[in-house]
């Protein structure tokens, strides 16, 4: 695979939305990653293979050259500091937004512009701290790895910062969105050394994927 391209991506929504993009570029996975237990999956193109890893690990694999190219959400890229990657293409998949949410009863009498200090549960402490610091709001951040909506319900935190798509999960747990932080989508990222050593192949891949991206 020294002259081929290794692409890192994660299971779930991003994978399902990325497969048609690759198919449109003439690259088909040889196996269904959702069904297979394999972590390295070949494609119908002998010069391309896929690594199926955790979403949060994609930037690390690409940064260190274990993968030449990867697909990662903008939330993951912003949360991890010090990444030395090219980010040539917004694939416009995995679209959602990052927001602050709180119990509906609290939101009825709340005014985000008046916040001076907040206690937030999130799996995005870096983004959260930076966002509130830019507004002059002091933060007490509790890092969680899942089920953010539970934190305000049991008194662990007053509010949460999380990704919101349909808003259904918030609603079912009695929470409402009170402030949007930023829009989120998945990006194509490229290892800097690979961009030099495999420029022709990677630039071809970028053009092929770009042609599949919905305007």
From Swiss-Prot:
Record carries keyword Glycosyltransferase: yes
PANTHER family: ATP PHOSPHORIBOSYLTRANSFERASE, ATP PHOSPHORIBOSYLTRANSFERASE ATP-PRTASE
Recorded domain comment: Lacks the C-terminal regulatory region which is replaced by HisZ.
Protein name listed in UniProt: ATP phosphoribosyltransferase
Keyword Metal-binding listed: no
A single MF term (Gene Ontology): ATP phosphoribosyltransferase activity
Entry's family note: Belongs to the ATP phosphoribosyltransferase family. Short subfamily.
Quaternary assembly: Heteromultimer composed of HisG and HisZ subunits.
Compartment(s) where it occurs, according to its Swiss-Prot or TrEMBL record: Cytoplasm
Function noted in UniProt: Catalyzes the condensation of ATP and 5-phosphoribose 1-diphosphate to form N'-(5'-phosphoribosyl)-ATP (PR-ATP). Has a crucial role in the pathway because the rate of histidine biosynthesis seems to be controlled primarily by regulation of HisG enzymatic activity.
Principal place of residence: cytoplasm
EC number, UniProt record: 2.4.2.17
One CC-aspect GO term: cytoplasm
GO biological process assignments: L-histidine biosynthetic process
Species annotation: Acidithiobacillus ferrooxidans (strain ATCC 23270 / DSM 14882 / CIP 104768 / NCIMB 8455)
